[in-house]
A protein has these predicted regions:
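Conserved PLP-enzyme active-site core in the AAT-like
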Residues: 2, 12-14, 18-21, 81-311
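N-terminal "arm"/small-domain region of PLP-dependent enzymes with the aminotransferase-like
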Residues: 2-62, 70-71
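Conserved N-terminal alpha-helix of the aminotransferase class I/II PLP-enzyme fold
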Residues: 40-92, 114-122
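Glycine-centered tight turns that cap/initiate beta-strands
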Residues: 77, 148, 314-317, 364, ...
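PLP-dependent enzyme catalytic core of the Aspartate aminotransferase-like
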Residues: 120-121, 129, 147, 294, ...
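Structural preference for beta-strand elements that scaffold enzyme active sites
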Residues: 151, 180, 202, 317, ...
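Conserved small-domain helix->loop->beta segment predominantly found in fold-type I
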Residues: 272-275, 280-281, 286, 290, ...
């Protein structure tokens, strides 16, 4: 093949994929398989000792999943990646090599409610502590870091409020403390935002959302830039010190820029078992082939709908970084020049009850707890996705009682506006009685 650098639209179709060597099939096959035959005993030993690359068992690596891993790593500009069963599993997998009981990580207050709940409660069972900080207060971010801090975590475009994190500023603070910056790029996708170019060291995805794009497959992904020095500080012994699971092998010394990726496959997936199913990887590969086309339409529709909502008398605010009036508009141009994605929130002047009435009155929008679908989705976070949070946490996450979250799809934008118009009228009519 000609030695050249391909564009994003080409890579989203071709990266990682090759014609099947056995059949010549051009589309990546679904290897619905668990185990793989060894050539001989020496081959088996080499695989188990991590001396040779290959397939052992699909909990660690599967041929279909491997194509997806290479494609997402390529699109993000990373050195390597490993897939997980869900986005929540990806968050566990990103932190697992870095943390020990008693360690902490600093996370943005502007996160998906499920992440806040996972960090606050489930991670306590591992002995991990989270410290939530508003990343707009950089002094507070610095102050939250101590000798037991092991990572800094944020979302590129926050769900649900559409807030855009100043990634360069967060990376500078993290690196000054000898810590990696982990960025959840689910809402933005690698088409809209390039976290590695702004200082991120690891990227997480819920591939369930825009990467798959059609709400057909659960999945997650952790992508490693491959440049963080895991041996420099002594803070990451799982990567820098001898591994008892592999007869004293040191992952960073042995695998260099792929240390985190190899650890993720050989230890995290092996022992926690959060692997992605081949069928789900196949569905996600199909979705990624049209990622740029879909995201352009998603963003155009979102801007049109948000602009209309901004002028509606029943609406108190619209939080969408793509609007010129947004306080994050300049940041959107810096980090997401092709568009600010299609997840945003707006507030209803009539509060919580009006929000409930609105989601029950829509006809074209689907009322459900997902995002990144080709279909337009609506939800009232305070009564659903962010219900477990305290009122204070809801407010910090831009998910207060009056807030509605939209995930704008690829339908005709005028049809979406018409549906919101009739639903808003229905919610106001009841309020006026």
């Amino acid at each position: 093949m000609t030695d050249r650098t391909y564009g994003f639209d080409t890579l989203q179709v071709h990266a990682g994929a090759r014609p099947d060597p056995a059949t010549g099939a051009r589309q990546t096959p679904i290897y619905q398989n668990t185990g793989y035959v060894f050539r001989d005993a020496a081959h088996a030993a080499a695989l188990f000792n991590l001396q040779e690359l290959g397939f052992i068992y699909s909990r660690l690596l599967n041929p279909t999943v491997a194509v997806l891993q290479e494609r997402v790593a390529t699109l993000e500009g990373g050195a390597g990646a490993f897939a997980t069963a869900s986005g929540h599993a990806a968050q566990v997998a990103a932190l697992f090599p870095l943390m020990a009981p008693g360690d902490n990580f600093v996370a943005s207050t502007r996160l998906y409610g499920g992440s806040v709940n996972q960090f606050n409660h489930a991670f306590k069972h591992f002995g991990w502590q989270v410290r939530f900080v508003d990343f707009e207060d950089l002094d507070a971010l610095k102050a939250a870091i101590d000798e037991r801090t092991r990572a800094v975590y944020c979302e590129a475009i926050a769900n649900p409020g559409g807030y855009i994190t100043d990634l360069s500023a967060a990376a500078e603070i993290a690196h000054a403390a000898g810590l990696p910056l982990i960025v959840d790029n689910t809402t933005a996708t690698p088409y809209l935002c390039r976290p590695f170019e702004h200082g991120a060291d690891l990227i997480c995805h819920s591939t369930t959302k825009y990467l798959c794009g059609h709400a057909t497959a659960m999945g997650g992904m952790v992508v490693d830039k491959g440049t963080f020095d895991w041996s420099a500080s002594g803070k990451y012994p799982a990567l820098s010190e001898p591994s008892p699971s592999y007869h004293g092998l040191k992952f960073h010394e042995t695998f260099g820029h792929l240390a985190f990726t190899f650890y993720g496959i050989a230890i995290t997936l092996r022992d926690l078992g959060m692997c992605q199913a081949p069928m789900n990887a196949f569905e996600t590969l199909i979705g990624i082939e049209t990622l740029s086309l879909r995201m352009d339409r998603h963003c155009a529709n979102a801007l049109k709908v948000a602009s209309w909502l901004e002028r509606h008398p029943a609406v108190s605010f619209v939080s969408y970084a793509g609007l010129p009036s947004s306080p994050w508009a300049a940041r959107a141009k810096k980090y997401c020049p092709k568009g600010a994605s299609a997840i945003f929130t707006f507030g209803l002047k009539d509060g919580y009850d009006a929000g409930v009435r609105l989601v029950e009155a829509v006809e074209l929008f689907s009322h459900l707890a997902n995002l990144g679908d080709t279909r337009s989705l609506i939800i009232h976070p305070a009564s659903t996705t962010h219900r477990q949070l305290t009122p204070e946490q809801q407010a910090k996450a831009n998910a207060g009682p009056e807030v509605i979250r939209l995930s704008i799809g690829i339908e005709d934008a005028d049809d979406l506006i018409a549906d919101l118009e009739q639903a808003l009228e229905a919610s106001r009519s009841v309020a006026a009685i």
